[in-house]
Amino acid sequence: MDLQLKGKTALVTGSTSGIGKAIAASLIAEGAAVIINGRREEKVNETIRELEKETPDARLYPAAFDLGMAEGCGAIFQQYPDVDILVNNLGIFEPAEYFDIPDEEWLRFFEVNIMSGVRLTRRYAKRMIERKEGRVIFIASEAAVMPSQEMAHYSATKTTQLSLSRSLAELTEGTNVTVNTVMPGSTKTEGVETMLESLYPGENLTAAEAERRFMKENRPTSIIQRLIRPEEIAHFVAFLSSPLSSAINGSALRIDGGLVRSII
């Protein structure tokens, strides 16, 4: 299937690793030019080199900006003032006891997970609506609808993304702009793999054994009983970025392996 992304330009925030990097790779494979974003220039350039090895004719542009800060969002817009696709993937997570989370940490999570998307869509989505064409995608989490007691601050930001995305979608009436949210379940990113290694110290479990145990003990409602692979999310995001997905707007879409026990 041709997703008709040739000639399109996408900004994928937080795209030097994990889900963001996989999304960038999927868009590149479909012919889109992609702006690679991370905080460190060295890491951004390294990611571009890796992606170019996979797709030699890839069109990739570096954007080493901290989008968890207003200054970074302003700077990236100044360098790349127009995109066809905006994927708000940037996000942070960290387990923490609710009663021990200080105000500063709540504000940090809000700045990175919410305000980065607010600031970027304020600029890019406005231009998309003016020309009546574009795609905005927020990467949230199943925690948006199934909040976690060990990550209350993270869960709250993910729920907020659903509301923000739907509000923005309402502004696109009469255009070919769409705004949607994708809610992945637990995903096999570098950060999650590191977390699994720390969960069972001294038990000499293989990575596969640790994954199965984690899913059984911590994600018992998952139907697939495994971590989701970043590329599984990325392929779906590529479709949402495509003109072929024009009837999907204002939606919150789960890729969670059946983790959330709901038919809607």
PLM-predicted stretches and their roles:
Residues 141:
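Residue(s) in the substrate-gating loop at a strand-loop-helix junction
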Residues 73, 97-98, 105-110, 218:
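Substrate-binding pocket helix/loop in short-chain dehydrogenase/reductase
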Residues 9, 16-17:
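Conserved glycine-rich cofactor-binding loop
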Residues 126, 170-171, 246:
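Alpha-helical segment proximal to the catalytic Tyr-Lys
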